[in-house]
Swiss-Prot record:
One Gene Ontology cellular component annotation held by this UniProt entry: cytoplasm
Protein's name according to its UniProt entry: Aspartate--tRNA(Asp/Asn) ligase
Residue span of region Aspartate: 201-204
Catalytic activity: tRNA(Asx) + L-aspartate + ATP = L-aspartyl-tRNA(Asx) + AMP + diphosphate
Family per record: Belongs to the class-II aminoacyl-tRNA synthetase family. Type 1 subfamily.
Localization per Swiss-Prot or TrEMBL: Cytoplasm
Superkingdom of this protein's organism: Bacteria
Annotated site residues (Important for tRNA non-discrimination) in this chain: H30
Subunit comment: Homodimer.
Gene Ontology BP, a term: aspartyl-tRNA aminoacylation
Gene designation: aspS
Native source organism of the sequence: Prochlorococcus marinus (strain MIT 9515)
Binding site for ATP: R223, D224, E225, Q232, E497, G549, L550, D551, R552
Record has Ligase as a keyword: yes
Amino acid sequence: MRNKICEELNKSDIGKEVNLCGWVDRRRDHGGVIFIDLRDHSGFMQITINPEDGETLFKQAEILRNETVIMVNGIVNERPKDSINKNIITGELELKVQDLQILNQIKNNLPFPVSVHDYENTKEELRLKYRYLDIRRGKLLENLKTRHKIIKAIRNYLDNSGFTEVETPLLTKSTPEGARDFLVPARLSNGDFFALPQSPQLFKQLLMVGGLDKYYQIAKCFRDEDLRADRQPEFTQLDIEMSFVSEEEIIAFNEKLIKHIWKNVLNINLNEDFPRMSWQEAMDNYGTDRPDTRYGMLLKNLGEILGNIGFNIFTKAIQMGGAIKSITIKNGNSSISNVRIKPGGDIFKVAQEAGAGGLAFIRVKGDELETIGAIKNNLNKDHISNILKITEAEDGDLILLGAGSTKIVNQSLDRVRQYIAKDLNLLENQKAQSQWNFLWITDFPMFEMNEEEKRFEALHHPFCSPKNVKFEDKKELTKKIETSTAYAYDLVLNGLELGGGSLRIHQAEMQKEVLRTVGLTDHQIDEKFGFLIEALEMGAPPHGGIAFGLDRITMLILGVDSIRETIAFPKNQQAKCLLTNAPSNVSKSQLKELDIEITIDE
C-alpha cells in the first residue's frame, strides 16, 4: 500500500512519486487549495489538493474529517519558502496529491482530540477507556518506543555477556512471598489452584541448579496489592541470575548494565561509581531504605539530649526503646508557619498519615530557641548548644522533631522530608532535576519483627543468604536473629527503588533453618518448598541475582509521574481495565465447570 513513511522523506525525494498512508491530523482550506497534515507513526507530511487536480479528488478532500484513515499517491515537491515549517522534519516538503483513497471513516465524534494541534489535558479515566486513541496522539507512542529501546539495550548487553533468556511458567504454585497471589482455578484438578507468579524467583534458582550459569528474562509478574502511582497488579521486571558469583561481582556487573542503558537510551555517560550505603545508615540518616540523596534535611538523633529533659512525650519514647529525631529546614522560619505544623496543618497531616501522633518544632532565632514552654523551660545552655551542633541549625532555621517508636519516627520524618522538599521546590532547580543519584543500599537485616503477629519476617525474602553464618554453624542464625544481616542489596535512584537482589541460600539445611525462623513448620516447608529443598540437595551451586522494575526504569528515564504512562494497556488504581471492563463476571456454566460457587457478604 505505502512505499514510504512520512519522516523518511527528504529533499532527495523531490520529484518522485510516493504512496503514503495515515490519518488526517487536520485539514485547512486556503484560497481554494486544501492542505492536509497527514500523520503516521513516524511524523507528519503536508499534502496539497487543488481544484484543477480533478473534481472528484477535490470533493473527496473537502469532506475529510480529522482521524479519517487515508492513502495518498502523489509527487514530492519543495514547499514555497513562506510556508516552510521548521518544527517538523518534513517541513520543507509537501506532497501534491494525484490520487486519494479513504481506507476508513470515523463513525462518531471522538471522545477527545487526537491531533497535537488540538491537544488538551484529558482525564485519565477517559484516556484509559480509549487507550488506542491515547496511543495515537503521539506522546504515549513515543513512550512505548522508548520502552522498546530500553529492552533492546538490555537484551543486547546481556546477550553479549553470555546470558541465556529463558521463559519461566506463568501458572505455578502459590507460595508465601509477601503480597497476595492472583489465583487461577485448575479445571482438571478441581479444588486446586495455580497462582500467577509474583516473581520467577524459585524457577531462576532451579535454572542455576540445572547448570544454566547466566539467566535473564523480561518477566511478567503479578501481585494482588493496593496500587500507587508506581504500582500495577501486573508488571514487568528484568530478572537476572548468575552462578558462582560474589555479591561484589553481581553489583559491579549490574552497575555496568544500568550505565549501558542510560548511554544507549539517553546518551548520558554515568562515569562515576555508584555510591553505597548500608541499610542501617540509610535508616539512621533518612528514615527509609530508598533515600533521595539530591537534597539535605538528614535525620538527626536527639535522644541523648532530649530524652531526659522532663518532657513526658520525649521521656516515654526513650523509655520504650524508641527514638527522638529531627530534620532541619534551612530558613524554615520564614517559609513554614506554625499553623502548618500544628494539628490540622498540612505538614502535621503528612506526619499523622505516616503514623505519628504529631510533630514538635524548634525555631532558631539568633542564639535562642523558640518552642513550646514544656520543652523550652527544661533546656539549659548545654542542651541548646548540643541541639544546634547536632542539627547544624542556624539563625532562621526550623527544626522539626518526631518522638516515639523508631519505625514510626523514621517513617513520618521521611514522609515530611519528601513533602517539604517538594513544597519548597528543592528539586525544581536545573541542577537537581538533571541529577541521576544512583545509590546501592547494602547489608539489609535478614529479618524484621512483625509487631502485630509477634514473629520475624524476611525483610527481602527467605531465600537470601545470611552473612557471617557458616553452613556448619547454621544454628547461629537462630541465636543471632535480630542482628543477622543478609547478602542483599537494592539499587535506588532519586528516592525510588529500581531493583533488588541477593546471594541465595544454596544449602538445603540452611534454607530450612531460615524458613523455620519465619514461622514455617517442617511440614509446611515440605508442602510449600519441598521441590526447592530437594533441588538444593542435588548439587546447587552458589548463586545470586537481581530483579529490576522495567516499568519504573522507563518511568524515570521518561521523566513521567506514573508507570501507567509507560505501559500500553495499564489498569487504573482500582486494578480495573477501563478499556475491556476487566475484571468482569463469568457465566454460571463456567463456574460450574470449575466447581466454584460464589457467595457475597452483605
